[in-house]
């Protein structure tokens, strides 16, 4: 560090360079303070939303319609889903008038009224002393009918109505129900829905060419946690856990399986994470390769002496991550699936691609202090936007020549020296991610961004804002399952209302196939 007396020895250009460096450090301090305040708020349970403004790159690079097709297409007529009831309205006319037919006027209405049914079940005593009672109609489970249960589930999960407001609404309609009973309607007996949500995840991970992932904060049992989203254009799945580590993400990728497996994929993962060679040989040469649960795996690590090692990187952690990855592969999940993320460390597993919107946002958020800085930043943003637009064009029509040209152009853009030190360091960092940013050149079917995950996860953020956290494991699992099922139905073009009706056995409801089968077998 220079003393004040040493500043006299510096030239004007050196002083200017040092001043710019200090300005950059000072500009970074508010971000550091904001992150520390956010961490303090998180520890206090007061985590606030991030303030991130979009750069506009995605919208600006959308292909423009041709001149011939520039007119906006009309919305078209809205089809009426209900059966139409005809009513003839008579007019008062003077004598001598001639009848000229009818003028049609279509309206839609909604009838919401309470219904109470007392079933009088016949009881018979057989000659051999047995009592036979007439069974309840299909769909009756408890003292609330399937239509009421469908209404409650749709309002709470799709309509984002809170439990107190739902109770008030039902009371106003004329349904005698308490808050505790509504909570039971939302949680009790929903195992089949949770199982179907898990099956959707397995089908998606087993058959998808790509998935996007994202996470957000979640409160459970008064503790901070994380909700992770996994999905693509055909399914969505949410899972709330207490951690956002890579270990947690690998656990979620098992899609409900609880085993740990040592196979070639697991060993390759351990090598990529720099686990010591002798430890890898121990695991590879041992006869035990499959472990039913966490306890069996931990006992195996203890037997080999791996868990007793206190070195960096942690061998227990890396070996466990590898065994989880081995389990994922053993169950036929993530076969050749590309995982697209925002560069969060926990998502960097398997074939990994990065979001271009998040990459450009780093350049967009840079603080500039001179005209030279601002010109350099804007020039680089324009170059990145043009490159992004050409990547979109390549996805629509991939060719080997364009692939090679884009690779060379990437190097020219991100190896550029602008004279803005902070920007140059950022460009070098982005260039180091070349392989993950250009996965699309080999796999043009994958998206260039994670906007799908960010859009999907907003429903969870909304639920968190209006309802807070969950108090029971069943409540947490039901919330995640139904939010995922509702999003999956929307992506498959299925009405969530009809889906609930089919699953609850409501009469005269169209059958809805298992969602996992639809995800696994696209039409």
Model-based region annotation:
Residues 1-143, 213, 260-319:
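Short, flexible loop/hinge motifs at secondary-structure junctions
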Residues 34, 121-125, 130-523:
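Catalytic center-proximal scaffold of phosphoryl-transfer enzymes
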